[in-house]
A protein has these predicted regions:
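Structural signal for interior beta-strand "rungs" in well-ordered beta-sheet cores
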Residues: 1-83, 87-89
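Generic C-terminal helix-cap and adjacent flexible tail
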Residues: 91-94
Length: 94
């Protein structure tokens, strides 16, 4: 049976969509109207920006930031800051 796991300290804002089999780490913020398609894995301490989309089977590394409106089509490394359509890394989150 498909399920979603959301760990402690995480915040899911209004209008966000989390589809089947997603796993969300500790202290993750999902901003308003962000969409996580199926089987997305988000590590601890991440921020997913407003109106962003994370495509199926994507992994977001620890401490990563996804900018508002970004479309994530590839895995995001730990502490990367990604923006754009498709999302590309612009710097490290220190």
């Amino acid at each position: 049976m498909p399920c979603v796991n959301i760990n402690s300290g995480s915040k899911i804002n209004i209008g966000a969509q989390i589809h089947h089999d997603c796993k969300i780490g500790k202290f993750v913020t999902i901003a308003p109207k962000a969409v996580l398609l199926g089987n997305v894995k988000i590590a601890d301490y991440c921020y997913i920006g407003a109106n962003s989309t994370v495509k199926q089977n994507i992994k977001i590394g620890k401490g990563a930031i996804v900018g508002a409106g970004a479309v994530v089509t590839k895995n995001v490394k730990s502490f990367d800051v990604v923006v754009g359509k498709p999302a590309k890394s612009i710097k490290k989150n220190k």
